[in-house]
């Protein structure tokens, strides 16, 4: 995270993966009686919405489309929404789009947070899967601005993508100590304690950077293979970071069914990751293709796709 000094006792907490952490953080933060907005990208990681609804808040969706480089148009959010907002979720690199927020965009969001007094929760689980340059993180921007207290800023990260350990359920939350202190108190009742063996395995994974670089190299090779072999058959656009293709198709559900029926390849229809808004459903006519299989399996997938395209 390019931070020189972070007090591990006040500015971070270990969690059982970011799914659990995101859900419980929302429950700890939201005042149900206020029925505030939680602003989030659309499409999105489904825990954002589920946690919001179960906390008694209202989701407000910002459509992430090709027109706004899949980053959303924060200027289009009405002032009356910001005034009632308790929490803003961002995901950078994005799931499913792979889009990365710039330093300038983070600064704009921090200014909005100061103006309207809401919390920014940055889901950065894909932040270590990049091609040429590491993406900027929220806390890094805070430090550059001299905000060493990280006021109203929280980051979520885990071993799931970085180390290919999604089943171990291990991650951390870092940021504003004034938010983490009551969140820790909530967690003492929540009962989410990490077993010692998971702690030891987590330490080993966090301490080793070579396997992370090896992981990045493998993803680079897989994306290069897909671009070379299928770029003339499919509108493949390499993401800014992450391991997903966000592929434009004529009809996402039909495309997914055809791939499953004819080639036994599973992709996720984009409409399942997004919600209908007044501007439409930004996930429609897209599918999410995850390059998480090894290179040999990816080569097999490519041959199967060539046979039916």
Per-segment meaning from a language model:
Residues 2-309:
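PLP-dependent class I/II
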């Amino acid at each position: 995270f390019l931070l020189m000094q972070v007090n591990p006792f006040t500015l971070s907490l270990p969690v059982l993966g970011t799914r659990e952490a995101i859900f419980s953080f929302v429950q700890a933060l939201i005042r149900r009686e206020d029925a505030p907005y939680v602003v989030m990208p659309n499409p999105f990681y489904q825990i954002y919405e589920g946690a919001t609804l179960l906390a008694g808040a209202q989701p407000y969706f910002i459509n992430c489309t090709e027109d706004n480089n899949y980053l959303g148009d924060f200027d289009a959010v009405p002032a009356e929404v910001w005034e009632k907002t308790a929490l803003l979720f961002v995901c950078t690199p994005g799931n499913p789009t792979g889009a990365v927020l710039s330093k300038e965009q983070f600064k704009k969001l921090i200014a909005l947070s100061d103006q309207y007094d809401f919390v920014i929760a940055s889901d950065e689980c894909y932040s270590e899967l990049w091609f040429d340059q590491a993406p900027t993180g929220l806390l890094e921007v805070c430090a550059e601005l001299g905000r060493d207290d990280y006021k109203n800023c929280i980051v979520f990260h885990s071993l799931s993508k970085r180390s290919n350990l999604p089943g171990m359920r291990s991650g951390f939350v870092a940021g504003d100590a004034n938010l983490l202190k009551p969140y820790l108190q909530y967690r003492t009742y929540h009962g989410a304690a990490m077993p010692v063996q998971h702690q030891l395995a987590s330490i080993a994974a966090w301490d080793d950077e070579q396997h992370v670089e090896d992981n990045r190299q493998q993803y680079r090779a897989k994306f290069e293979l897909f671009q070379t072999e299928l770029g003339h058959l499919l509108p493949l656009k390499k993401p800014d970071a992450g391991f997903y293709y966000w592929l434009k198709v004529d009809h996402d559900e039909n495309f997914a069914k055809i791939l499953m029926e004819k080639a036994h390849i599973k992709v996720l229809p984009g409409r399942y990751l997004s919600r209908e808004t007044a501007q439409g459903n930004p996930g429609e006519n897209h599918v999410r293709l995850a390059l998480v299989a090894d290179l040999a399996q990816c080569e097999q997938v490519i041959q199967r796709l060539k046979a039916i395209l």
